[in-house]
């Protein structure tokens, strides 16, 4: 208190606000700092930490074996694809480090990746897991929505715009990100002959993607929006952005078979028999650039995707593993949901096999597992929040096939869902 009986007014030493203008004023040796200035300092430190972490992360890059073992925690099977991806990604970020240190040395070219595999085999999950592991910006684009510049639809530069938005318009960070372009097979040209008419969503998009994938400086409108004359653009160099393209390439196996079955004629010709029993995934392993050209990709685009990884169709045992083993396994997710209602969920091995068989029959791969399990548990999840004394829900093979509802076990005695 001052001599006049009035309280001495204290001020923040940084912003000058009085103690009555802020929530809290913290005293130090002859200085004061308010809660607002502390919050501002925290924001500044928080912005600088990711940059330091990214630099430290790049200097301590995990080895291909370490990358593959981390992928194993999330993606079941696909060992060959994981090995190819691990080496390609490791070499890519090692190349960035080399370029930063040795600007005038041998220039290392970029190796973008093409993933070929049936739907639900893990193409997208592999790319997402890689980005999360390396702590780099990651964006997914759908090739089917892209058109040539000047036509209705998404411009290919929108992909880079999304990447910029992902890292709050930090250009340096965006220039070392990963872009995954899905459904790349859907922009194949309609025939293997060059088209005389404009193909704005097929071959035209492939042509537009060429420079972007190889490396160019893209002009991106700030904070999104359309391009306008006399507008300032954000310049993004795509040279160090890793592009991963993925597609199911349905029908490519027929192109490969027709090539491999071609033979000479006459008595000295080699006799080749059709191997109809060979799995699609096994046939795709024999894919050559000429097959992709025949399928409808232009040679220039294939040349810019030098690393090709083929994913196999998932078998029943692999689908069962996907349901239970990964960190974010589907069964674990539903068990967590049920635990929020204080109910235990048990899915028996026979039920897991039935789910896997159903997904195989539908030809939806791992992507179809959730819809099958969701359908089996729908009525139970609808009724359960309004029910009392339910301790456990048991799912068996008959529940998946639709013959019987899930078994509800109450605190006193077991009871079947839906019975009185």
Swiss-Prot record:
Pfam families assigned: AAA_2, ClpB_D2-small, zf-C4_ClpX
Coiled-coil boundaries: none
Binding site for ATP: 118-125
PROSITE patterns: CLPX_ZB
The ClpX-type ZB domain, residue ranges: 1-53
GO CC terms in record: HslUV protease complex
Binding-site positions, Zn(2+): 12, 15, 34, 37
Alphabetical UniProt keywords: ATP-binding, Chaperone, Metal-binding, Nucleotide-binding, Zinc
NCBIfam families in the record: clpX, PRK05342.1
HAMAP family noted in UniProt: ClpX
Listed PANTHER family: ATP-DEPENDENT CLP PROTEASE ATP-BINDING SUBUNIT CLPX-LIKE, MITOCHONDRIAL, ATP-DEPENDENT CLP PROTEASE ATP-BINDING SUBUNIT CLPX-LIKE, MITOCHONDRIAL-RELATED
Similarity comment: family membership: Belongs to the ClpX chaperone family.
Name recorded for this polypeptide: ATP-dependent Clp protease ATP-binding subunit ClpX
Natural source organism: Dechloromonas aromatica (strain RCB)
Annotated gene: clpX
């Amino acid at each position: 208190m001052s001599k006049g009986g009035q309280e001495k007014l204290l001020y923040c030493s940084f912003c000058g606000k009085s103690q009555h203008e802020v929530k809290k004023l913290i005293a130090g040796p002859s200085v004061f700092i308010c809660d607002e200035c502390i919050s501002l300092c925290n924001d500044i430190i928080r912005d600088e930490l990711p940059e330091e972490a990214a630099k430290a992360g790049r200097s301590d890059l995990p080895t291909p074996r370490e990358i593959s073992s981390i992928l194993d925690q999330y993606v079941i099977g696909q060992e060959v694809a994981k090995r190819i991806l691990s080496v390609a990604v490791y070499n890519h970020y090692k190349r960035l480090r080399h370029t930063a240190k040795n600007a005038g040395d041998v220039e290392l070219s970029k190796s973008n990746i093409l993933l070929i595999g049936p739907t639900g085999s893990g193409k997208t999950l592999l790319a997402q897991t890689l980005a999360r592991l390396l702590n780099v910006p990651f964006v997914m684009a759908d090739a089917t929505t892209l058109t040539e510049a000047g036509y209705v639809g998404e411009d290919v530069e929108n992909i880079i715009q999304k990447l910029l938005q992902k890292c709050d318009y930090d250009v340096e960070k965006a220039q070392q990100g990963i872009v995954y372009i899905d459904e790349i097979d859907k922009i194949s040209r309609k025939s293997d002959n060059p088209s005389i008419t404009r193909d704005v969503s097929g071959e035209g998009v492939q042509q537009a993607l060429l420079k972007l994938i190889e490396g160019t400086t893209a002009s991106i409108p700030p904070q999104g929006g359309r391009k306008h004359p006399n507008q300032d653009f954000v310049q993004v160099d795509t040279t160090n952005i890793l592009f991963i393209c993925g597609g199911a390439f349905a029908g490519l196996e027929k192109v490969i078979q027709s090539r491999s079955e071609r033979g000479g004629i006459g008595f000295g010709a080699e006799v080749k028999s059709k191997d109809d029993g060979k799995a699609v995934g096994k046939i795709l392993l024999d894919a050559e650039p000429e097959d992709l050209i025949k399928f409808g990709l232009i040679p220039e685009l294939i040349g810019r995707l030098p690393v090709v990884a083929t994913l196999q169709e998932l078998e029943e045992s692999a689908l069962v593993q996907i349901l239970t083993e990964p960190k974010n396994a589907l069964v674990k997710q539903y068990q967590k949901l049920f635990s929020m209602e204080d109910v235990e969920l048990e899915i028996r091995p026979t039920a897991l096999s039935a789910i896997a068989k159903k997904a195989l029959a539908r030809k939806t791969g791992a992507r179809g597992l959730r819809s099958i399990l969701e359908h089996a548990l729908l009525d139970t999840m609808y009724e359960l929040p309004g029910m009392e004394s339910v301790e456990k829900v048991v799912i068996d093979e008959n529940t998946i096939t639709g013959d019987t509802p899930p078994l509800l076990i109450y605190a006193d005695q077991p009871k079947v869902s839906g019975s009185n």
